[in-house]
């Protein structure tokens, strides 16, 4: 039993760790792309729009890989932690379902518009698409963190006669003090990751005297976001 539990933990830990590499960068790049689109809209300088298009391609690829690596993690709730899922499913399934039904579809729908609809949407419509992708990605992070925070610090629940859990206050689950702290920590880490990735690529381009104009934008936006 102890060996099986250890294997389950290692298995799940590897899956979660590998998966989180991708949504962390996705959530970090989303607000930076909005910043680039905002600067392009206000200044009418093509360099900002071109920079946003460049990072949007990376965002799109990273988003797809993040979705694919997240599917095995969901399956492992049943394969590795079946009894836990059975007992607590009435609680943790709520934020996880909202992540899929609301924020994931919001992000996915507007990402499609953002990737392929620039010419049809116009500049302001394209900016709104970028902003909604940002909102969707950060909402996804919030619902996932809320589910994790409840596992660490259970609130707003009752135990039923069969031993399972039920929610007594959905807002109590979402406003869990641990969830708010974890969410702030997670989003700061994601933003720093995205900022450093952008600044690092810009620095690499500058060192190689390649696309200097874009490289300066990458470094400036990345460093400012990372420091702030």
Task: Please tell me what each predicted stretch does.
Residues 1-228:
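Polytopic transmembrane helical bundles with strong interfacial aromatic enrichment
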């Amino acid at each position: 039993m102890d060996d099986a539990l250890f294997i389950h933990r290692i298995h799940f830990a590897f899956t979660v760790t590998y998966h989180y590499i991708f949504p962390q960068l996705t959530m970090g790049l989303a607000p930076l792309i909005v910043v680039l689109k905002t600067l392009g809209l206000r200044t009418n300088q093509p360099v900002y729009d071109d920079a946003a298009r460049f990072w949007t391609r990376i965002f799109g690829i990273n988003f797809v890989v993040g979705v694919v690596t997240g599917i095995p993690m969901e399956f492992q709730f049943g394969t590795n932690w079946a009894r836990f899922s059975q007992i607590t499913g009435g609680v943790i399934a709520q934020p996880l379902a909202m992540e899929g039904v609301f924020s994931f579809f919001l992000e996915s729908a507007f990402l499609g518009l953002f990737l392929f609809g620039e010419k049809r949407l116009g500049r302001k419509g394209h900016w709104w698409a970028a902003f909604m992708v940002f909102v969707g990605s950060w909402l996804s992070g919030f619902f996932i963190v809320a589910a994790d925070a409840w596992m660490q610090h259970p609130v707003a629940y009752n135990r039923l006669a069969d031993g399972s859990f039920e929610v007594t206050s959905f807002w109590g689950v979402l406003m869990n003090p641990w969830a708010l702290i974890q969410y702030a920590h997670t989003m700061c880490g994601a933003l720093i990751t995205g900022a450093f990735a952008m600044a690092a690529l810009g620095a690499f381009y500058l060192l190689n005297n390649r696309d200097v104009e874009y490289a300066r934008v990458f470094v400036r936006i990345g460093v400012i976001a990372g420091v702030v």
